[in-house]
From Swiss-Prot:
PPIases accelerate the folding of proteins during protein synthesis. It comes from the Eukaryota. This is Peptidyl-prolyl cis-trans isomerase FKBP10. The gene is FKBP10. CDD domains: EFh (cd00051). It comes from Bos taurus (Bovine).
Length: 583
């Protein structure tokens, strides 16, 4: 470096004797310079600022360290020196006697990227002595200078916030791990590096010695999504050594930084409740099966996945290791219908490797979750009585009963599925006959006519994992039911029962024309008469004609289209005979 060795170019000061001679010349004030009266020799440096940058954040002052290029010529245009020819910038402190006086004065007030033409009179250059073999005595010197860098040993890191998001969940602190994009330039705008060309962010710890000191300082306090301009003096960057061929010695560095995300290895899952429905009577625990919608994004807002785009909830067990640990933790304690934001550090998500092409390594993940429903495989039907006519509730529905009921069915998020009111008539069912889902069958039992209930039916007592037409798989169903009517059912296997003992000589009563045989017409007429007279009843909920036809087929043993006295036998007698045979 220039401070350590002998002079390497003509701008450096002469030996002490020559210096003392030059200092005898009275210096004139700094400025554009002026000639002596009557066209005599120049009294001061003449400065022509022929290119001034539009923005000048700082000007060269006494004691600043500068880096610049120059061409030096005589009045006739003959070149005597050039930093360009040496492919080396001048890097030196201004105003402390390291440069000829004319150059010291000519650099004062200069901006980075400014270009100046300087005319240095002999007494502010190399005087009457000159430089043997290079600069003759009393030579006026002409310099074309471009300033590329300026800094001072008192400088600190300069941070300018270009964009700061309105919501800042956390700021960078020492020991945090950050992911950021950057463009790196020298102070004159020369680019030396960028993360954007490398297909990924720059990922590192802050304050742990992994970065240059100035970047460690410049990142502190940043928010995810914030953009900063960070100007770093060389003694907080790469100093005298520079870096390879891209960062010269003693170069100030400028970084334009976009912080993508930040976390700390000690971070846990962060929860934020966005919407909590009233009346949360149950919260999810490990072992529950949950259906939820989500939007998944990186900390800078980049969306990487969404269940909404698939028009299907994400269905899984909670706390069983089927999903990333952070989501397993974040879903527990949630209510049905709740909306919450779950922020998951990478060590509880996909770690250093990331996954696929949308989640990079060491990425913090943010999930906005809407819990649709959850249940436990051991859940029974939840029954809540809404209204019950106590004064008329003498009998309740039981297995085998034939019932009429109205119902509304929806998902727990309020999505309407079915309603008996859409059909203009109550639904009918025989309890225990497996004609309705098990949970609804269970929920109807024990109801009085006129009673209203709310039933919460878990999927294993409804339509299971596969769902049904209009019903998603693994969906918990919500029913509001009202029992309209009920009839006692018949014993299993019976199509008709007598209210009292059957008539004696049953065949004679059935043989209406007394011809010794009963065709289907006579049989049907007889059974219908028993029902209309209240002496017996058919299996409820079935087509009477079909039921009577089945009864006739059972009695017509030889299938000849008529029943004889020998063929006719009551079911109770058949059951008794079967018991005897088994015995």
């Amino acid at each position: 470096m220039l401070r350590a060795g002998p002079p390497s170019h003509t701008l450096l000061r002469l030996p002490l004797l020559q210096l003392l001679l030059l200092l005898l010349v009275q210096a004139v004030g700094r400025g554009l310079g002026r000639a002596s009266p009557a066209g005599g020799p120049l009294e001061d440096v003449v400065i022509e600022r022929y290119h001034i940058p539009r923005v000048c954040p700082r000007e060269v002052q006494m004691g600043d360290f500068v880096r610049y290029h120059y061409n030096g010529t005589f009045e006739d245009g003959k070149k005597f020196d050039s930093s360009y020819d040496r492919h080396t910038l001048v890097a030196i402190v201004v105003g402390v006697g390291r440069l000829i006086t004319g150059m010291d004065r000519g650099l004062m007030g200069m901006c980075v990227n400014e270009r100046r033409r300087l005319i240095v009179p002999p007494h502010l250059g190399y005087g009457s002595i000159g430089v043997a073999g290079l600069i003759p005595p009393d030579a006026t010197l002409y310099f074309d200078v471009v300033l590329l860098d300026v800094w001072n040993k008192e400088d600190t890191v300069q941070v300018s916030t270009l964009l700061r998001p309105p919501h800042c969940p956390r700021m960078v602190q020492d020991s945090d791990f950050v992911r950021y994009h950057y463009n790196g330039t020298l102070l004159d705008g020369t680019a030396f590096d960028t993360s954007y060309s490398k297909g990924g962010t720059y990922d590192t710890y802050v304050g742990s010695g992994w970065l240059i000191k100035g970047m460690d300082q410049g990142l502190l306090g940043m928010c995810p999504g914030e953009r900063r301009k960070i100007v770093i003096p060389p003694f907080l960057a790469y100093g005298e050594k520079g870096y390879g061929t891209v960062i010269p010695s003693q170069a100030s560095l400028v970084f334009h930084v976009l912080l993508i995300d930040v976390h700390n290895p000690k971070d846990t899952v962060q929860l934020e409740t966005l919407e909590l429905p009233p009346g949360c009577v149950r919260r999810a625990v490990a072992g529950d099966f949950m259906r939820y919608h989500y939007n998944g994004s990186l900390m800078d807002g980049t969306l990487f996945d969404s269940s909404y785009s698939r028009n299907h909830t994400y269905n899984t067990y909670v706390g069983q290791g089927y999903i990333i640990p952070g989501m397993d933790q974040g879903l527990q304690g949630s209510c049905m219908g709740e909306r919450r934001r779950i922020t998951i550090p990478p060590h509880l998500a996909y770690g250093e490797n990331g996954t696929g092409d949308k989640i990079p390594g060491s990425a913090v993940l943010i999930f906005d979750v809407h819990v649709i429903d959850f249940h436990n495989p051991a859940d029974p039907v939840e029954i809540k009585t809404l209204s019950r006519p106590l004064e008329t509730c003498n009998e309740t529905a039981k297995l085998g009963d034939f019932v009429h009921y109205h119902y509304n069915c929806s998902l727990l998020d309020g999505t309407r599925l079915f309603s008996s009111h859409d059909y203009g008539a109550p639904q009918e069912a025989t309890l225990g006959a497996h004609k309705v889902i098990e949970g609804l069958d269970t929920g109807l039992q024990g109801m009085c006519v006129g009673e209203r209930r709310q039933l919460v039916v878990p999927p294993h007592l409804a339509h299971g994992e596969s769902g049904a037409r209009g019903v998603p798989g693994s969906a918990v169903l919500l029913f509001e039911v009202e029992l309209v009517s009920r009839e006692d059912g018949l014993p299993t296997g019976y199509l008709f029962v007598w209210h009292e003992d059957p008539p004696a000589h049953l065949f004679e009563h059935m043989d209406l024309n007394k011809d010794g045989e009963v065709p289907v017409e006579e049989f049907s007429t007889f059974i219908k008469a028993q029902v209309s007279e209240g002496k017996g009843r058919l299996l409820p909920g079935q087509d009477p004609e079909k039921t009577i036809g089945d009864m006739f087929q059972n009695q017509d043993r030889n299938q000849d289209g008529k029943i004889t006295a020998e063929e006719l036998k009551l079911k109770s007698d058949e059951d008794q005979d079967r018991v005897h045979e088994e015995l």
